[in-house]
Regions:
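Single conserved hydrophobic/aromatic residue that forms the stacking wall/gate
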Residues: 197-208
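Low-complexity, Ser/Thr/Pro/Gly-enriched N-terminal "stalk/linker" regions
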Residues: 1-72, 91, 97-138, 174
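Asp-box/WD-like beta-propeller blade repeats and closely related beta-sheet repeat scaffolds
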Residues: 129-151, 183-196
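Well-ordered alpha-helical scaffold segments within catalytic/enzyme domains
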Residues: 18-19, 24-28, 76-90, 158-174, ...
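Alpha-solenoid helical-repeat scaffolds
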Residues: 66-70, 86, 150, 154, ...
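Generic alpha-helical secondary structure signal
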Residues: 21, 44, 48, 71, ...
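Alpha-helical solenoid scaffolds that mediate protein-protein interactions
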Residues: 83, 96, 103, 167, ...
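Aromatic- and glycine-enriched glycan-recognition loops and surfaces
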Residues: 86-98, 152-155
């Protein structure tokens, strides 16, 4: 009789805090990244979010891609959470918690917790749910990736939901999960009730 086979995992995950870089090119690069994250002003990353729910912005948006208000703050939450998990730098956690406080204040101004895309963006999703898709409305550069006046919204939503998830998973911020769940409830209801064509057409526009 053969002995029972014992499953030995080929690999297993480990926490970011279990890896410590010594003085090297990678450590210098990591320190540069950490310094950059600490240099950014949270109030300049999300003034458009505050304005979209009727609150006054506390700063001016950064220039370039952020000039008209973008979703970089989602990536910023991910970066701060992971860098905090790697380094234990409390200043990163402080920035992350401040951003979460601000986003939760925005969320409280809405009837259903949806604050990401503002009123116009929300209406665009509801139009999708009704089967209405207006494609190829170019943005200010002429790029035809706009639909239902929503820009590249699935892309932005992913950044923000992932940022909140990472704040919870990597930095242990319970508040991030509290903000995330109403957002996930709203957008999952939309996504689960869309036809394949109404999923594929907008996402194809975003891939152009």
């Amino acid at each position: 009789r053969k002995a029972p086979r014992v499953h030995v995992p080929v690999w297993q995950s480990f926490a970011l805090s279990e890896v410590e870089l010594t003085d090297s090119y990678f450590k210098k690069a990591m320190d540069l990244h950490k310094g950059y994250l600490l240099s950014l002003d949270v109030d300049r990353l999300i003034p458009h979010v505050r304005r979209s729910v009727g609150l006054q912005g506390k700063g001016d948006n950064y220039g370039g891609w952020e000039k008209h208000g973008g979703c970089t703050y989602g990536h910023y939450m991910s970066a701060c959470a992971m860098m905090y998990a790697s380094t234990g730098e409390k200043a990163l956690l402080d920035k992350l918690n401040y951003m979460l406080d601000e986003l939760q204040e925005c969320q409280k101004q809405t009837p259903d917790g949806w604050f990401i895309t503002g009123k116009r963006g929300k209406e665009g999703y509801l139009q999708l749910l009704q089967g209405n898709v207006v494609l190829n409305q170019p943005d200010e550069t002429g790029q035809p990736w706009n639909y239902n006046q929503n820009g590249n919204s699935w892309y932005c939503i992913h950044k923000i939901l992932a940022g909140l998830r990472d704040a919870y998973v990597y930095a242990g911020c319970r508040q991030a999960k509290d903000i995330l769940m109403p957002l996930a409830d709203f957008i999952s209801h939309i996504a689960l009730n869309l036809s394949l064509i109404h999923i594929s057409e907008p996402t194809r526009q975003e891939a152009i």
